[in-house]
Regions:
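N-terminal alpha/beta PP-like core and its mobile active-site loop of ThDP/TPP-dependent enzymes
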Residues: 1-332
């Protein structure tokens, strides 16, 4: 076993099925030997774009890794990595690095140093025996908290170095933790939902990544609240549903603007409320904003937030649905907003 075999075995243990890649990387052959399918691309960015699309299509529920050659290969992937970072895509990127003896020699490119600001977590591994621990840390970052790309740079000479077969036994697959928001905060959110005369829900990509589409639908139906999806959240709420107003993109249905303008409560669920020229701007004055997010850095980032909850969307919305059923009955309230 060598370093490439060790990393490939870890990827398989974590459920990685495809490895979009640009040669040369010894990880490509190591992965193919154990049925982790390499997808060879013609330009480095394409590897990350393939993984990006795959992860969005599966709602972030599948694991996916990418690899490219060190130096120019790693540099060429930067634009696609920045896109994944901007859109919170939970991708594991394993760029090659210069040999350990050449680290820190100018102008050799270091992904670990240069990708710090376009990734959620960015490190390098320098010894074969550290691979299990660094990969475990990488997957823990990948699976928990706010989604985003995780980068682990692997010097190319580590791929061919001998690795003790017992190292794989040190690896512990990482699970996703789904903390629920505080119970009293959930009750206060339900109070606000029921007290509002014209509430609107803004549902984001966090609903998809949490697998909380069913809970969102139940909440909207019980409280009879119309739902607008963000661009990245498109698909989290069925657009043929009577309570769907459509997507709040730059091009949007008239109902999106009409309901936002008359809303007295705007509730963001699984969204960062990020301002963008591609997203419908939300009115600020004369309304209350509530937000459910799994990362405190999203709160009041671009909009004034009156009430925030921190937690995973699925258990938090499930608890809100349970409380609504207790207050309103399983049929919910009559009429709609």
């Amino acid at each position: 076993m060598n370093g490439a075999d060790l990393i490939a075995q870890i990827l398989k243990r974590e459920g990685v099925k495809i490895l979009p890649a640009f040669p040369h990387s010894d990880l490509i052959e190591a992965a193919s030997k154990i049925s982790v399918r390499p997808i060879i691309v013609r330009q480095e960015r394409q590897a990350l774009h393939i993984a990006d699309g795959y992860l969005r299509a599966t709602g972030g529920q599948s694991a996916c890794a990418t690899t490219v050659q060190h130096g120019p290969g790693s540099e060429n992937a930067a634009g696609a990595l920045a896109q994944c970072f901007a859109d919170n895509v939970p991708l594991l990127h394993l760029p090659g690095g210069y040999a350990t003896a050449d680290q820190g020699v100018s102008p050799n490119f270091s992904a670990a140093r240069n990708f710090q600001h376009i990734s959620k977590w960015c490190e390098a591994v320098h010894r074969v025996e550290r691979i299990p621990q660094m990969m475990q840390n990488a997957f823990a970052q990948l699976r928990n908290g706010k989604p985003g790309p995780v980068v682990l740079e692997v010097p190319h000479d580590l791929y061919t170095q001998d690795a003790d077969p017992g190292l794989i036994d040190q690896y512990r697959p990482q699970r996703r933790s789904t903390p629920c928001a505080d119970g009293s905060d959930i009750s206060k959110l339900v109070d606000r939902l029921l007290a509002a005369s014209a509430p609107v829900i803004i549902a984001g990509q966090g609903i998809l990544y949490a697998g909380a589409a069913d809970e969102l639908t139940q909440l909207a139906e019980l409280a009879q609240i119309p739902v607008i999806s963000t661009l990245n959240g498109k698909g989290c709420f069925p657009e043929n549903h009577p309570l769907s107003l459509g997507c709040a993109g730059l091009s949007r249905p008239d109902g999106v603007v009409q309901f936002l303008n008359k809303a007295d409560l705007v509730v963001g669920l699984g969204t960062s409320f990020t301002r963008s020229e591609y997203i419908t701007p939300f009115p600020r004055a004369g309304r209350t904003y509530a937000q459910l997010t799994n990362w405190e850095g999203d709160i009041a980032k671009d909009y004034p937030i009156d009430f925030a909850l921190i937690g995973d969307a699925k258990p938090t919305l499930a608890a809100a649905v349970k409380e609504l059923c207790e207050r309103l009955g399983t049929s919910g309230r009559r009429g709609n907003s």
